From Swiss-Prot:
The lineage of its organism: Bacteria, Pseudomonadati, Pseudomonadota, Gammaproteobacteria, Enterobacterales. Residues 5-59 form the HTH lacI-type domain. This is HTH-type transcriptional regulator TreR. Homodimer. Pfam families: LacI, Peripla_BP_3. Disruption phenotype: Cells lacking this gene are constitutive in the expression of the treBC operon.
Length: 315
């Protein structure tokens, strides 16, 4: 059986010093791109990751997990992270934060760095474009949040249920001309599932659907709300709080105050600025807690990967 390679071995095979290998492992500056690529190629060729004892000697915690968010400024993801952190701290784990910016390539790079650092596990906020092959190494030590993948642990929101709750509330209030502002179907959860839930409710209750799917940004809500407002429209359902905030700004500027807004999110900013908007809480805080607890249970051998659905509740 082949002996495990050490940092000294990687340095020798790469033709560099041990300190250079250490800087590459920790993704630190001070290493040329050419040298970094040469060291990484050697590590990948030999499947190298530092031992826990080596990490401890470098002053690193023996219990480290990573949280990869899509955007550091995401209101919903921050609500989930706020409940993850105490759960990890309580069990002695040091969390590190990374950002994917909805880039599968960045996720792959982050996972490569984390693999080389031999961390304990990862919570990954999922999005369209992440493949199961990309995650293969992490099957027993990763939890996906807001997306699911076969064979992997996941914590997902009930997207269809959230829309159904809001549509039912608006319908019960007497609204029969309910428009929809959402996200393209390339986003499977926030986009496709929520829009299809809106269409299904309209079909079941014989309502005429009027929808636009511009994207996630507040500005897109602002710029596209006029496309879904007809003279008959009495209510507007937005797939996210950010879209609702953009739509609300447009309606205020146009002095339209008879339209009932509804949205999925219930973030603190929305509740403070627009308490009149009907919202559902998808369970961001609970999802964060569940994701942290599931990951800890997996890496300590107390649980196999499980798929968890967080129910939405009317705020």
């Amino acid at each position: 059986m082949q002996n495990r390679l050490t940092i000294k071995d990687i340095a020798r095979l790469s033709g560099v010093g041990k300190s250079t290998v250490s800087r590459v492992l920790n993704n630190e500056s001070g290493v040329s791109q050419l040298t970094r690529e040469r060291v990484e190629a050697v590590m990948n060729q030999h499947g190298f990751s530092p031992s826990r004892s080596a990490r401890a000697m470098r002053g690193q915690s023996d219990k480290v997990v990573a949280i990869i968010v899509t955007r550091l400024d995401s209101l919903s993801e921050n609500l989930a992270v706020q409940t993850m952190l105490p759960a990890f701290y309580e069990q002695g784990y040091d969390p590190i934060m990374m950002e994917s910016q909805f880039s599968p390539q960045l996720v792959a790079e982050h996972l490569g760095v984390l693999k080389r650092r031999n961390i304990d596990g990862v919570v990954l906020f999922g999005f369209t474009g992440i493949t199961e092959e990309m995650l293969a190494h992490w099957q027993s030590s990763l939890v996906l949040l807001a997306r699911d993948a076969k064979g992997f642990a996941s914590v997902c929101y009930d997207d269809e249920g959230a829309i159904k709750i809001l549509m039912q509330r608006l319908y019960d209030q007497g609204h029969r001309n309910i428009s929809y502002l959402g996200v393209p179907h390339s986003d499977v959860t926030t986009g496709k599932r929520r829009h299809e839930a809106y269409l299904a409710f309209c079909k079941a209750h014989k309502l005429h659907p009027v929808a636009a799917l511009p994207g996630l940004a507040m500005k897109q809500g602002y710029e596209n709300v006029a496309k879904v407002i007809t003279p008959e429209t009495t209510a507007l359902l937005c797939a996210t709080d950010t879209l609702a905030l953009g739509a609300s700004k447009y309606l205020q500027e146009q002095r339209i105050d008879t339209l009932q807004l509804a949205s999925v999110g219930n973030t603190p900013l929305m509740k403070f600025l627009h308490p009149e908007i009907v919202t559902v809480d998808p369970g961001y805080a609970e999802a964060g807690r569940q994701a942290a607890c599931q990951l800890i249970a997996q890496v300590t051998g107390r649980s196999e990967p499980q798929q968890i659905i967080i129910p939405a509740t009317l705020s």
